[in-house]
A protein has these predicted regions:
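Positively charged n-region of N-terminal signal peptides that target proteins for export
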Residues: 1-4
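Sec-dependent N-terminal signal peptides
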Residues: 6-9
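N-terminal signal peptide c-region/cleavage motif recognized by signal peptidases
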Residues: 14-16
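Short loop/turn and low-complexity linker motifs enriched in small/turn-promoting residues
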Residues: 20-147
C-alpha cells in the first residue's frame, strides 16, 4: 500500500513539474494576472484605465496586454474610461489568486447608443494564448520597465 501511495505522489509531482509549458513562470510567492484587450475598430481610440484592488495599473490599448504580479488572495480587477461619469458603468471581475499560478482576463468593448463599457471575462490559458498570440505589452508597462 505504501508503494502505491509513493508511486502516485511521485507521478503527481512529476507531471506538475512539466505542466506549465514554455511560457513565463510567475514567482512562487506571487500570482500573475494578465489583462488583455482584443482589437475593436470602433473603440480603438479609447484607452481604458485598468485598476487592480483600486490601484491604477495602466491604460489598456487595443491589441495589448498588461501583466500584474499580486499576492495570493482575492483581487478585484476593474476598468474606467476617462471623461464625465454620466451614464458610465464601472466594470469589474474578482480573481482568487494562488501563489505560483497565472490568471487571464479578456477585455472586450461593448457599446450602446449612450455608453461604452469594457466587459471582462476570466479565460483559460489556452484561450488566452490563442488571443494574445500577436499582442505586445502595453506601452505604459514598457515605459515603466525601461526606467
Amino acid at each position: 500500500m505504501k508503494r502505491i501511495v509513493f508511486a502516485c505522489m511521485a507521478l503527481l509531482m512529476g507531471t506538475a513539474t512539466f505542466a506549465g509549458g514554455n511560457g513565463p513562470k510567475p514567482k512562487a510567492e506571487t500570482a500573475t494576472i494578465y489583462i488583455y484587450r482584443t482589437g475593436s475598430w470602433g473603440a480603438a481610440a479609447n484607452n481604458w484605465a485598468m485598476f487592480v484592488d483600486e490601484k491604477k495599473v495602466c491604460k489598456l490599448s487595443n491589441n495589448r496586454f498588461i501583466k500584474v504580479e499580486v499576492a495570493p488572495g482575492k483581487h478585484r480587477v476593474s476598468s474606467k474610461i476617462g471623461g464625465i461619469e454620466l451614464l458610465k458603468k464601472v466594470t469589474e471581475i474578482e480573481i482568487e489568486a494562488e501563489a505560483g499560478k497565472s490568471y487571464f482576463v479578456a477585455c472586450n468593448v461593448k457599446q450602446s447608443l449612450t455608453r461604452a463599457r469594457l466587459e471582462m471575462t476570466e479565460v483559460t490559458k489556452s484561450s488566452a494564448d490563442k488571443q494574445m498570440e500577436k499582442m505586445t505589452l502595453d506601452k505604459c508597462q514598457e515605459e515603466a520597465e525601461t526606467k
